[in-house]
């Protein structure tokens, strides 16, 4: 996994490069301590750059269809995506997942099952944000209410799992998660 991170770093600067001043005392003597931290030479504060938590949902209905959304915003505007997003401060990953599903599809779900995670760099406002993406299986049973795309989803649609094409997903991290999901569950 470290080799993959080294490959990402060729294209995305380390997030600590953007931090020039100590967030505690404001000193400009905020220097690299090691790969994941900077230390203030004046007040001694050490800042660790940790990834942000993000989620993605594989929502599957009884007809073996996957709920996907079409991205309304950059990056990868107009391509397919999975419902999900960043976990807010004060939320658990599960709460963040449920909130994102509601925000993007207006779907209230009760059951989520953790699948897997992967490191990612998400481009936001010209800066690479290091994330830890956590993917969940979200089974929905019975009659599913009408789905309404909202928030940063332009459209929400059900696609038979057998017809899901990873190449249609615009974000590399999501595309890789879809491939992994399809392989792990022997759908392809």
Model-flagged regions — what are they?
Residues 31-37:
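Short linker/helix segments within small regulatory modules
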Residues 30-31, 48:
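Short functional micro-motifs and their immediate structural scaffolds
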Residues 116-145:
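Active-site-adjacent beta-strand/loop module that shapes the phosphate/pyrophosphate-binding cleft
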Residues 15-21, 36, 53:
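Short metal-coordination and nucleic-acid-contact micro-motifs, chiefly zinc-binding Cys/His arrays
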Residues 1-18, 145-188:
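Nudix hydrolase/Nudix homology domain
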Residues 42-66, 86:
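Conserved N-terminal beta-strand and adjoining loop/helix that marks the start
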Residues 22-25, 40-43:
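Short cysteine-rich clusters marking metal-coordination/redox-active sites
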Residues 9-12, 61-103:
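Conserved Nudix-box catalytic region and its N-terminal flanking loop in Nudix hydrolases
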């Amino acid at each position: 996994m470290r080799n993959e991170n080294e490959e990402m770093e060729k294209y995305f600067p380390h997030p600590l490069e953007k931090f020039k001043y100590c967030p505690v005392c404001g000193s400009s003597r905020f220097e690299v301590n090691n790969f994941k931290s900077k230390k203030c030479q004046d007040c001694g504060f050490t800042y660790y750059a940790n990834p942000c938590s993000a989620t993605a949902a594989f929502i599957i209905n009884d007809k073996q269809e996957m709920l996907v959304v079409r991205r309304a915003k950059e990056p990868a505007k107009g391509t397919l995506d999975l419902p999900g997003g960043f976990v807010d401060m004060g939320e658990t990953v599960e709460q963040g997942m449920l909130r994102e599903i509601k925000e993007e599809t207006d779907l209230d779900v009760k059951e989520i099952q953790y699948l897997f995670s992967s490191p990612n760099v998400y481009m936001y406002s010209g800066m690479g944000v290091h994330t830890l993406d956590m993917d969940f299986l979200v089974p929905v049973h019975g009659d599913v209410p009408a789905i309404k795309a909202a928030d940063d989803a332009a459209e929400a649609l059900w696609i038979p799992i057998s017809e899901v094409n990873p190449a249609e997903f615009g974000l590399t991290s999501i595309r890789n998660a879809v491939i992994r999901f399809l392989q792990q569950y022997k759908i392809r």
